[in-house]
Amino acid sequence: MNKLIYILLTALLFSCEKNIDFNLKESPNVLVVDAEIENGKAPTVVLTRSFSYYSQINAQLLSESFVRNADVYISNGTLTHKLKEYAYPLVPGVLAYLYSIDSASLSTAFVGELNTGYTLKIISDGKEYNSAARIPELAGVPDSIYFKQAPFIADTNKKAMFVKATEPAGLGNFYRYLTKVNNGLFLPGENSVFNDQVIDGSTYDVQFPQGINRNDPPKADSNFYNRGDTVTFKYCNIDKSTYTFWNTWEFAYQSIGNP
């Protein structure tokens, strides 16, 4: 009797199988805008085209994805400057392109300033794109930075970085942090943005994990630093729209499953 039940259950399980084929449509290429402006620094804009999810990534494909000969304008409300296209080596024999200040038109050029809003206009392939951002005033600024033995790790050379800072009273401040180790690049943390919903008006003492390169496979000790490292900590005050973008992007990056 038990054998018969087992056979019936096995047959039932196999009968539930069904092959499903998804007919994924090719999405049209869209313009991807990566624009930055910081206090005391010139604006930079990188324009690329998206490519198919199934594309085989190589240097040539990346080079061909850059959008060239676009008209790119940035304004601080007083001056409007047309950015110039520049080429720089991506890998040996392959060039990448960005737009930044035109040294031939310095009368309208400017760098980022605190408490200033900016608008960006891009004209490419007969289409116009517009966006706006703001560099806020400095709000919370770190009081001190120090290192402690990394928790739950026996290696005494591994260190965790802590930051003590005071958040001014009044909701509406947003932050992003990046770290640079020795002569490396500035890299954002896995959760690089946060707001003042919890820390408003308080002094907090929090661990800030090392920034990560999302092109590399994850490492068990990637949150920590090594004894002897030179660490540069970049603590940014950002506006709400910038916070919302990075918060959404990082949440999607860490989520498992379909977008």
Question: What annotation goes with each model-predicted range?
Answer:
Residues L12-S15:
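C-terminal motif of bacterial Sec signal peptides marking the signal peptidase cleavage site
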Residues E17-P259:
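A sequence/structural signal for flexible, mid-protein segments enriched
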Residues N2-I7:
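Sec-dependent signal peptide recognition
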